[in-house]
C-alpha cells in the first residue's frame, strides 16, 4: 500500500500538470486573441483558430494532460486530481473519509503552484491579459445557468470515471484516453457557457494567482465551480452505484 504522503504528492503533481497545461492553454488562447490588449477577461472563445476551434484546442490540452497524469500517476494515488472526484468516490464508499481532506489540500496546492509556475514561464501578461485561464460565466449566462452547466458536465465526467476506472469489469488500460477525451468533449461543448471547469482545484489555482499578481478578484464566482462539480460528481457516483447494484 502506497503511503498517504506519497499519494498526496502524486495528487499535487497531477493537479499541477492539469492546471499548467490545461488552464495554461486557455490563457495562451486569450493572449493570442487579444493582440496584447486586455479584452473582456472572460471572453476566450475567439483566438487564433476562431470560436469553436479554440475550445477544441483547449479541450485537447486538458484531455492530454489528464491522460498523461492518469497513466503516470494512477497506480500511485488513483489520480483524482479533482476535489469533486474525491468527494464523489467518498460518497459511494470507494474512498476513505479520513483521506478526503489531505487529498483535496494536495490538489488545491498543486493547482495553485501549477498556475504560479505558468505565470513565471509566460510572464505577467498571462495574468493581466490571459487571466491564467480562469473560469467565469460568459456574457449573457446567469450564475445559475453556469452552475447547472458545471453540474451536467461533471456528472458526465464522473459517470465515465465510475464506468471505465472504478468498475472492476471495465477493460484495463483505457481509462486515461477515455477520460481525457471525455473532458475534451465537455470543454468543447460547455466552454462558452461556464468556462467548463468541472473541478474546484482547476479554478482555484488561477483565481488565487490572478488575485495576487493581477489584482483581479473573481471569488464571487467560485461557488459555481465548487457546488456545481461536487453536486454533479456525487449524483453521478450515486446513479452509477444504483444502476449497477443487484
UniProtKB/Swiss-Prot annotation:
Residue interval(s) of motif NPA 1: 82-84
Main location: membrane
Topology feature Extracellular, residues: 33-55, 125-145, 194-217
Protein name: Aquaporin AqpM
GO CC annotation, single: plasma membrane
Positions in the Cytoplasmic compartment: 1-11, 77-103, 167-172, 239-246
Subunit structure: Homotetramer.
Pfam family, one: MIP
Keyword vocabulary terms for this entry: Cell membrane, Membrane, Repeat, Transmembrane, Transmembrane helix, Transport
Coiled coil: none
Membrane topology qualifier: Multi-pass membrane protein
PANTHER family: AQUAPORIN TRANSPORTER, MIP17260P
InterPro entries, per the entry: Aquaporin-like, Aquaporin_transptr, MIP, MIP_CS
Subcellular location field: Cell membrane
Family of this protein: Belongs to the MIP/aquaporin (TC 1.A.8) family.
Source organism superkingdom: Archaea
Positions of transmembrane segments: 12-32, 56-76, 104-124, 146-166, 173-193, 218-238
Free-text domain note: Aquaporins contain two tandem repeats each containing three membrane-spanning domains and a pore-forming loop with the signature motif Asn-Pro-Ala (NPA).
GO MF term set: water channel activity
Motif (NPA 2): 199-201
Free-text function comment from the UniProt entry: Channel that permits osmotically driven movement of water in both directions. It mediates rapid entry or exit of water in response to abrupt changes in osmolarity. Also exhibits a transient but reproducible increase in the initial glycerol flux.
Amino acid at each position: 500500500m502506497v503511503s498517504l504522503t506519497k499519494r498526496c504528492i502524486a495528487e499535487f503533481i497531477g493537479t499541477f500538470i492539469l492546471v499548467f497545461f490545461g488552464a495554461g492553454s486557455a490563457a495562451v488562447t486569450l493572449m493570442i486573441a487579444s493582440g496584447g490588449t486586455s479584452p473582456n477577461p472572460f471572453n476566450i472563445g475567439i483566438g487564433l483558430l476562431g470560436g469553436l476551434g479554440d475550445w477544441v484546442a483547449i479541450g485537447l490540452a486538458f484531455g492530454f494532460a489528464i491522460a498523461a497524469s492518469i497513466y503516470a500517476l494512477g497506480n500511485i494515488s488513483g489520480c483524482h486530481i479533482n476535489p469533486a472526484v474525491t468527494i464523489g468516490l467518498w460518497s459511494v464508499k470507494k474512498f476513505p473519509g479520513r483521506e478526503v481532506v489531505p487529498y483535496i489540500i494536495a490538489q488545491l496546492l498543486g493547482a495553485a503552484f501549477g498556475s504560479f509556475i505558468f505565470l513565471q514561464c509566460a510572464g505577467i501578461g498571462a495574468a493581466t491579459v490571459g487571466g491564467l485561464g480562469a473560469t467565469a460565466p460568459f456574457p449573457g449566462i446567469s450564475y445559475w445557468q453556469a452552475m447547472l452547466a458545471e453540474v451536467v458536465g461533471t456528472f458526465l465526467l464522473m459517470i465515465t470515471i465510475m464506468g471505465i476506472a472504478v468498475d472492476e469489469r471495465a477493460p484495463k488500460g483505457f481509462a486515461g484516453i477515455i477520460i481525457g477525451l471525455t473532458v475534451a468533449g465537455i470543454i468543447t461543448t460547455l466552454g462558452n457557457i461556464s468556462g467548463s471547469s468541472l473541478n474546484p482545484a482547476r479554478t482555484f489555482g488561477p483565481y488565487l494567482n490572478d488575485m495576487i499578481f493581477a489584482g483581479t478578484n473573481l471569488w464571487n464566482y467560485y461557488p459555481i465551480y465548487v457546488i456545481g462539480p461536487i453536486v454533479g460528481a456525487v449524483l453521478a457516483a450515486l446513479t452509477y452505484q444504483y444502476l449497477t447494484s443487484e
